[in-house]
């Protein structure tokens, strides 16, 4: 016999999956058809789920949809299992189609594999940070020179975090400028604006968004209520990159990632 917890979880999962698939509320009769649980029993669990703030109704006469909190928990659980899996993208047009079909904003930028190889002193006038494929140039200061020596062997993201922590503003700005030059692809900027509905949306348009991601999955306060963003490690046209995917919590990111993997 199915336990009440199992039934409740099963009903909630069915509501989530149906909404992701059809973007439409689901009622007790449809759940009964999908799950073979009596409609009267389903109504009891719908009341419990509603009381717990896990589902809601857009209108009194309509079916149920998952709440924003439910979707946040759903994507958190999903991403814990998926975030370390490899993603390969072989053409830009495929990303453009995905952005349009799923109404997501997409930003692809390089620099993931950049590691500080050497710190050079140019006549005590400039300091050159050599990342092998890229370089940064700073004004020479003895204190900065000594500090930067300790960063040799670290990747660009780690150096950026340290620079932010110690308020090394010149270095932070140089890294931001470098990241701008490393943008490989961007699509659906209109969606970026829709997420914020104000001038805040510009932070999604450049690589400074990278440092706002404390984790690879972010909700509020980085994104407005009801929206989210994923920062994905990937290969894009053979280059190590990060990809930002941003959109509604009701967007099917599971399907998006599946499409990407199938196209690889």
Swiss-Prot record:
SUPFAM superfamilies: Winged helix' DNA-binding domain (SSF46785). GO terms for biological process: negative regulation of DNA-templated transcription. The keyword Chaperone does not apply. One of its GO terms (molecular function) is DNA binding. Keywords: Repressor, Stress response, Transcription, Transcription regulation. InterPro entries: HrcA (IPR002571), WH-like_DNA-bd_sf (IPR036388), WH_DNA-bd_sf (IPR036390). PANTHER family: HEAT-INDUCIBLE TRANSCRIPTION REPRESSOR HRCA. Negative regulator of class I heat shock genes (grpE-dnaK-dnaJ and groELS operons). Prevents heat-shock induction of these operons. Belongs to the HrcA family. This is Heat-inducible transcription repressor HrcA.
């Amino acid at each position: 016999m199915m336990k009440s917890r199992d039934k409740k979880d099963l009903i909630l999962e069915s509501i989530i999956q149906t909404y992701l698939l059809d973007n439409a509320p689901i009622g007790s009769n449809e759940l009964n058809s999908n799950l073979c649980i009596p409609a009267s029993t389903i109504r009891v669990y719908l009341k419990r789920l509603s009381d717990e703030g896990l589902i809601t109704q857009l209108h009194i006469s309509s079916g149920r949809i998952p709440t924003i909190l439910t979707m946040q928990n759903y994507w958190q659980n999903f991403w814990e299992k998926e975030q370390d899996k490899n993603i390969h993208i072989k053409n830009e047009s495929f990303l453009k189609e995905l952005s349009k079909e799923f109404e997501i904003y997409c930003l692809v930028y390089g620099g993931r594999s950049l590691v500080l190889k050497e710190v050079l002193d140019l006549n005590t006038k400039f300091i050159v940070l050599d990342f092998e494929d890229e370089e940064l140039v700073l004004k020479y200061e003895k204190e900065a020179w000594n500090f930067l020596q300790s960063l040799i062997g670290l990747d660009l993201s780690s150096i950026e975090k340290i620079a932010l922590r110690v308020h090394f503003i010149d270095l932070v700005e140089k890294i931001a400028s470098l990241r701008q030059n490393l943008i490989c692809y961007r699509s659906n900027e209109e969606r970026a604006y829709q997420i914020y509905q104000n001038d805040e949306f510009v932070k999604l348009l450049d690589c400074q968004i990278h440092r706002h991601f404390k984790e690879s999955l972010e909700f509020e306060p980085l994104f407005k209520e009801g929206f989210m963003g994923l920062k994905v490690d990937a290969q894009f046209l053979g280059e190590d990159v990060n990809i930002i995917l941003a959109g509604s919590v009701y967007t099917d990111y599971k399907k998006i990632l599946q499409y990407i993997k199938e196209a690889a």
